[in-house]
Amino acid sequence: WIMGHMVNAIEQVDEFLNLGANAIEFDIDFDKDGIAQITHHGIPCDCGRKCTKKAIFTEYLDNIRQVTTPDDPKLREQLVLLALDLKLQRISSAKAYRAGEDVAKKLLDHYWQRGNSRARAYILLNIPLVEDYEFIRAFKDTLKNEGYESYNDKVGINFTGNEDLDKIRDVLEILGIHKQVWQADGITSCFARGTERLKEALEKRDTPGYSYINKVYAWTLVRKSIMRRSLRLGVDGVMSNNPDRVIKVLKEKEFADKFRLATYNDNPWEKFRG
């Protein structure tokens, strides 16, 4: 999975897909009451990027629904995963539950259209810190209460704050989540980051019977040398400002026979058995 990073304006979707991404990450900004308003990162952000691009969240969902719906004129078949980077750290933890309700309802109304949409992308909920786990509870409660619990099959969980992996596991246990879990490891492209935690996540992913990590990705990679390092370690995905660079690295002799781009037929919740 090549995840285009910070794809917050509607016109950027095609831009990143044209560069080779098969997944996109966009930032969800909330008001003080936990209501999702816009797709927007804000300052500061990655080096060399404009941080201020934005869209109305519901309008963004309306567009991305078309881009991921078979037979729609806007369909881009390669786009199979949507990562929602939830900016919960900007609001009170007491509002995390309300935020989860709101995002679930907006996805129901504007993406899935309560069963009337054929939009097919998988959804990854990126939670910044384990203290905001009530967002996940609320999201699942809302799908159940609204009568659309089946959409849980399309939704995965990912904690992005580089916290202790055992602490993350404990929170997942509290929530009763034992599947459909990704684990991110990374830092803004402005800085270097070691591989200790990334290696630990990969080791847990590959441990037989360990159900709290199905996929691991590294972010935000812009240098080919770091992309190569991550691929050698065996990541499932890379988040990048430059998907075209990832494509070029994947075509190199060292990687061409070991990796390929994920398609809709690849289940993002299953561990890869090479």
UniProtKB/Swiss-Prot annotation:
Residues given in the record as Mg(2+) binding sites: 25, 27, 85
Catalytic activities: an N-(acyl)-sphingosylphosphocholine = an N-(acyl)-sphingosyl-1,3-cyclic phosphate + choline; an N-(acyl)-sphingosylphosphoethanolamine = an N-(acyl)-sphingosyl-1,3-cyclic phosphate + ethanolamine; a 1-acyl-sn-glycero-3-phosphocholine = a 1-acyl-sn-glycero-2,3-cyclic phosphate + choline; a 1-acyl-sn-glycero-3-phosphoethanolamine = a 1-acyl-sn-glycero-2,3-cyclic phosphate + ethanolamine
InterPro entries for this protein: PLC-like_Pdiesterase_TIM-brl
Keywords: Cytolysis, Dermonecrotic toxin, Disulfide bond, Hemolysis, Lipid degradation, Lipid metabolism, Lyase, Magnesium, Metal-binding, Secreted, Toxin
Gene3D superfamilies: Phosphatidylinositol (PI) phosphodiesterase
Active-site residues annotated for this sequence: 5, 41 (nucleophile)
Annotated cofactor note: Binds 1 Mg(2+) ion per subunit.
GO function terms (MF aspect): lyase activity; metal ion binding; phosphoric diester hydrolase activity; toxin activity
Entry's EC annotation: 4.6.1.-
Subcellular location: Secreted
Disulfide bridges in this chain: 45-51, 47-190
Listed GO CC annotations: extracellular region
Similarity annotation: Belongs to the arthropod phospholipase D family. Class II subfamily.
The protein's name in its UniProt record: Dermonecrotic toxin SdSicTox-betaIIB1bxiii
